[in-house]
């Protein structure tokens, strides 16, 4: 079992080190990144990343705007890696 990562950089490193493992396994199950991975398409996640942090999501997930952005970026990284595996 993989330990969840907490930054986009850590996620990139894990995926680079083990391209055969599903990238979603590196996301904490209860994280906003995992929620985005499970509920958004890659294009939806990219669109979210290009706008300001959603204040309602920040409140719900107890994230700062910068943390929100990092979580969305992690979902994008994981979704991109998953698409490459197919």
Give residue ranges: language-model regions.
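Short intrinsically disordered terminal tails
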Residues: 1-9, 77-86
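Acidic, low-complexity, intrinsically disordered interaction modules
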Residues: 21-79
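N-terminal acidic leader/helix
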Residues: 3-31
